[in-house]
């Protein structure tokens, strides 16, 4: 299942997409500040969403002030 990830700072979206790719995610930009993400290492959509939320929050800790919204 693909999830949509919207970032408040479009200049950092490429960096986040690269970080996601290093973790085995497939991500493609669908708007200047939005990407579609698939995490194939999970069994369910709920598991994928939880894993991605955890990863994005950890990434945000190194990027104060950047907001990220994950949705289906």
What do these predicted ranges mean?
Residues 7-9, 40-41:
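Structural motif
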Residues 14-34:
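A short, structured beta-strand/loop element
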